[in-house]
Amino acid sequence: MEFKVQDYKKGQPRWCPGCGDHFFLASLHKAMAEIGVEPWNTAVISGIGCSSRLPHYMATYGMNTIHGRAAAIATGCKVANPDLTVWQVSGDGDGLAIGGNHFIHANRRNINLNMILLNNRIYGLTKGQYSPTSPRGFVSKSSPYGTVEDPFRPAELCFGARGHFFARAVATDAPGTVEILKAAYNHKGAAVCEILQNCVIFNNGTHDAVYSKEGRAKNAIYVEHDKPLIFGENREYGLMQEGFGLKIVKIGENGITEKDILVHDAHCEDNTLQLKLALMGNGDGFPVALGVIRDVDAPTYDDCVTAQIEEVKAQKKYHNFAELLETNDIWEVK
């Protein structure tokens, strides 16, 4: 059965004009249509925040739940109904502050969820407080002299929790966003997609280096499994391994050719180089990595729970509560 973008649309979004949530919502609708996701077999779960209004604009099942608990509720949905496709949507505040513990455990357990993290480095709904991803020194209503905290780096948190899938896109890059959403859907297990977006009211310009197509040509690298790590406006630069780190080289200089450039391996179990890629671009002179950075197969929590239940049931004399009630004499009271 074929679906159209219109099949997933619902309601009128109430985000500020220019908010990155608009761009992401359009990409999610498009990705679902291209995948052929059945709306009646899909649930979108969110917490609290601007981005967490997203389930209201999806013609699927969904819940706009409580602050920070989207991953926990999405886990319950998936374990109770393994055939359901579950998308969990959180902002950086909702997902990594009050929801940080649920984020790491959903990754550790490897629950088959598509986990979307909309990262604008600010609390928008509560009017401009710094978030767990705001950079050190960031001036906000809750840090008028600049925050003295180091931020979470979502990829680092995901990898540290033994996450098996991590991808990144920019909200304004619709093709790039659609591709990682499709990859997340096809991955079996917890799939974290970080979406870089601006908050036009309280943190406009936070991702300006990669927000425009021209900016991405200069300041980003699109990574693809089994492809060389090449970037630049004219694809003139590449990445090579140097010791335990990476270095930027110019193709054609000092005898360097494309054959010398490091090839991306998203399926490598060891995440050392994947993490190096994911952490680039924070004022270090390296480009921001976009695309699927890590995609490794592993047993999923929901499959293991279902298999365990079936295994135990097969060993028991009674397989459900109704059978247990009918084990002895039964009387019907009228």
Describe the residue ranges of each PLM region.
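Short coil/turn connectors at secondary-structure junctions
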Residues: G11, E38-T42, A80-V86, R108-N114, ...
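Glycine-rich beta-alpha junction loops
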Residues: I48-C50, N120-I122, D173, L196-I201, ...
